[in-house]
């Protein structure tokens, strides 16, 4: 214990006596003064700043590199990937410049460019946002706009979104302030009509108003460790100025508004009559979206102004869905093959089976999102039996299985070569039904 013969207590770290310092905190066989506590606090804060600075010192992926990374997980959507790559690169370049203290020649303040993703259900909006966050190694939080309401009403407060991001960052405020928030179903919070209403629209225009400041940049007060707010509580302050907000929605019916704008004036005897097959495709119409179209759809002008970057996604066709099943790093067929290999069983899909899965997803109009449910239904009985069977080496799925006309074929022998130490799931075996 740091105690002199005279009985006077001293700090175990700096050696100063109780009379020389403001406070002396006693521990087991040791003391620490308030000055040493301040020094320790400074050291911890400096260490945290260095860790945060590590992000700024890293090489920021260039747009081409971001696009290449997205290509590994997302099939198609070339224009959307290019738009996102540039927008995300510029956003984090802006952050990096601010962190390093770099000021442009004319001291121009670069505004934040949040992103609006417009595309059909299952076209890859959420996956794009998740992949970007994983690539940049930043916290990522997702929220459903349909659950949001204005503060004071039953439902989820918009500040809860930032709270989710803070939780994902393990309550590291510096880390959370560089994260990405994806708000899905943003098209569901449009105002009910273009005319002002006497009743309060707490889940439509009201939510847009509540999101305005959050998206643009404000200091949000978040209760610690996800607790509820109460007046005597200390809050965690989070600045949302550098958080990248990506909003996505299917915007069903928006294409009709764009089409009407293009056809305006084509009325009368000299109007050109278009055949049905000449009607512009959904993707082409989405690419021509203007802010006025979004206002007509029900988004308020101020909200649209906070989302200056608009990226549109195309509806996935059969070929794209087949690619999604086999080509990405985490392709669905590879995921199921990996599950089967844990039971020491090979899983083989005939090409006709993959085509049938893609066709079924198109019929359901669920895009890539519907592929997993189809696969689950097809393989349910097999996955139920497999752990109890030791006589199966290979499971073959053909077109008839997908159509519900047959059961998967079980074979005793393995069709894929295995490493004795490790299963390689990188290469999926796809065979043509003609050669089977």
From Swiss-Prot:
GO CC terms, sorted: HslUV protease complex
InterPro entries: AAA+_ATPase (IPR003593), ATP-dep_Clp_protease_ClpX (IPR050052), ATPase_AAA_core (IPR003959), Clp_ATPase_C (IPR019489), Clp_protease_ATP-bd_su_ClpX (IPR004487), ClpX_bact (IPR046425), P-loop_NTPase (IPR027417), Znf_CppX_C4 (IPR010603)
Domain ClpX-type ZB: 1-52
Key word Zinc present: yes
Gene3D superfamilies in UniProt: 1.10.8.60, ClpX chaperone, C4-type zinc finger domain (6.20.220.10), P-loop containing nucleotide triphosphate hydrolases (3.40.50.300)
Residue spans crossing the bilayer: none
One Gene Ontology term of the molecular function aspect: zinc ion binding
Binding site for ATP: 120-127
Pfam families: AAA_2, ClpB_D2-small, zf-C4_ClpX
Record text on subunit structure and interactions: Component of the ClpX-ClpP complex. Forms a hexameric ring that, in the presence of ATP, binds to fourteen ClpP subunits assembled into a disk-like structure with a central cavity, resembling the structure of eukaryotic proteasomes.
Family of this protein: Belongs to the ClpX chaperone family.
Biological role stated in the UniProt entry: ATP-dependent specificity component of the Clp protease. It directs the protease to specific substrates. Can perform chaperone functions in the absence of ClpP.
Protein name: ATP-dependent Clp protease ATP-binding subunit ClpX
Species, as recorded: Acinetobacter baylyi (strain ATCC 33305 / BD413 / ADP1)
Record gene name: clpX
